[in-house]
């Protein structure tokens, strides 16, 4: 059995592999960046009663839409190419966060958070499918475990990023900063996928 280093060296598209790991981290960062400030932001939008319950519903809205649409997004990725779907989903997610900064009521924020979950439902299957295609069969479990490491790292960094932005710039800039992160990852992946934009599949060969 190959060592982890030998496995990584055997993968031809190492740059794309790193890009997918970083995208997994970004997915969690953009999903979790508003978690620390959400109850405060919901209160600033005018919610006084059942503040924690309403905040919880807004957080859950993303998970509900991801659950509803992830299967459909997986089929769409098979049809148009998972690398293309990743790019579209990152653009979509960044735009949704800009709209979240403009929300006037908790209801609007909840609807936008629900719509954001559709993008998450596209990102996660897309990354998994691409990793599966780029990785030798004997190394899939290890590569997926490394990908999970980056995903969980995003869950740590996202709330820290959101809290830091809030402390220095206020509520709205948490959303703008998160949108900027999504757009930055989009540009990075556009560079990595530049040779594959006209084809449907990205494969190891």
Positions of PLM-derived features:
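Juxtamembrane intracellular "pre-TM" segments in multi-pass secondary transporters
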Residues: 1-20, 204-205
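Pair of pore-lining "gating" transmembrane helices in MFS-fold secondary transporters
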Residues: 13-34, 114
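Short amphipathic helix-loop junctions that connect adjacent transmembrane helices
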Residues: 36-53
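Residue-level signature of mid-helix packing/kink "hotspots" within the transmembrane helices
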Residues: 63-71, 155-156
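Helix-to-loop junctions at the C-terminal end of transmembrane segments
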Residues: 68-81, 166
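Paired small-residue
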Residues: 96, 107-115
């Amino acid at each position: 059995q190959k060592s982890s280093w030998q496995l990584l060296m055997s993968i031809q598209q190492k740059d794309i592999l790193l890009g997918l790991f970083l995208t997994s981290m970004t997915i969690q960062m953009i999903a979790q960046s508003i978690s620390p400030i959400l109850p405060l932001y919901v209160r600033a939008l005018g919610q006084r009663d059942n503040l924690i319950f309403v905040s919880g519903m807004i957080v859950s809205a993303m998970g509900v839409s991801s659950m509803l649409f992830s299967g459909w997004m997986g089929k769409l990725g098979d049809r148009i190419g998972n690398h293309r779907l990743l790019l579209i989903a990152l653009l979509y997610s960044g735009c949704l966060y800009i709209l979240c900064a403009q929300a006037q009521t908790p209801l609007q924020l909840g609807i936008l958070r629900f719509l954001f979950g559709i993008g998450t439902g596209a990102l996660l299957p897309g990354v998994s499918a691409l990793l599966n295609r780029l990785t030798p069969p004997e190394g899939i479990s290890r590569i997926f475990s490394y990908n999970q490491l980056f995903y969980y790292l995003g869950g740590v960094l996202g709330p820290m990023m959101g809290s830091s932005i809030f402390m220095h710039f206020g509520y709205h800039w948490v959303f703008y900063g998160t949108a900027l992160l999504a757009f930055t990852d989009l540009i990075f992946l556009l560079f990595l996928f530049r040779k594959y934009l006209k084809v449907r599949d990205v494969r190891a060969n």
